[in-house]
């Protein structure tokens, strides 16, 4: 018989991980406070998502947000949770949320040096049918000495200090990067803590899955149509790619990270600038995918190189395994050359 205990006595929790990263960077502790506050909000949202049906949180709150999406009751709750937790961390100065038309400026007595862009509940159109949804965030340093304003959030993704997403699925998971790879943490409901389950996850060089909304095939540009045709009917006799699309970006991106392949929300005739928002949807997931060895592009440039012009700016997004994204870009270049 073994005398090994069934309980882990030296587990790496996300709280401990964040503190260790801060110590290694010889930081002030402000980013540690910020990340821990974000994690508290994520735990609270996870709890609300699990209780939503019983607590009458499904359904529409009776309004439309700034980007034209119907606002769900859980959206409103999640947004308030994140804003309140971040402002009470004393580490933020500007908050940009999908749910707020303008940036939220933290009160002077609570201000810190960080800017946070977030989508409190991504994929909320899937709430009522219990499909996976998530929270996405990116953290930047304020780069000027001026009074905090919306302009402080208009930084390219290359300036990100830390980014991540939470996925509320069969379990609650957080993918987090502070610029040194991507680590995955799962919420242990017994402990109420996120525990490290995978360190330095790497995306496959090439996958076997493509993910996009083929319902919009009527509006696809020539490059997208050509690429999808190649995946479904390979000319080299290889097996076709599998098609997977949840319609909740966090779920689709996380599957792409874990299994490899490509996720696409390209520009089309209906949405010539793309549909996903740069600051709080595209940049955080592009950062995670690049940190894991993948690629993320708008079709014309890396997502993280885009210089934002407005806080709710939309861009096309194609990300995933480097060889798959490169093949898509080859289709784009070929079609541009043929014009």
UniProtKB/Swiss-Prot annotation:
Its cofactor is Mg(2+). The modification Phosphotyrosine is found at residues 216, 219. CDD domains: FBPase. GO terms for biological process: fructose 1,6-bisphosphate metabolic process; fructose 6-phosphate metabolic process; fructose metabolic process; gluconeogenesis. Mg(2+) 1 binds at residues 69, 98. Mg(2+) 3 binds at residues 119, 122, 281. Keywords: Allosteric enzyme, Calcium, Carbohydrate metabolism, Cell junction, Cytoplasm, Gluconeogenesis, Hydrolase, Magnesium, Metal-binding, Nucleus, Phosphoprotein. Pathway: Carbohydrate biosynthesis; gluconeogenesis. It comes from the Eukaryota. PANTHER family: FRUCTOSE-1,6-BISPHOSPHATASE ISOZYME 2 (PTHR11556:SF13), FRUCTOSE-1,6-BISPHOSPHATASE-RELATED (PTHR11556). This is Fructose-1,6-bisphosphatase isozyme 2.
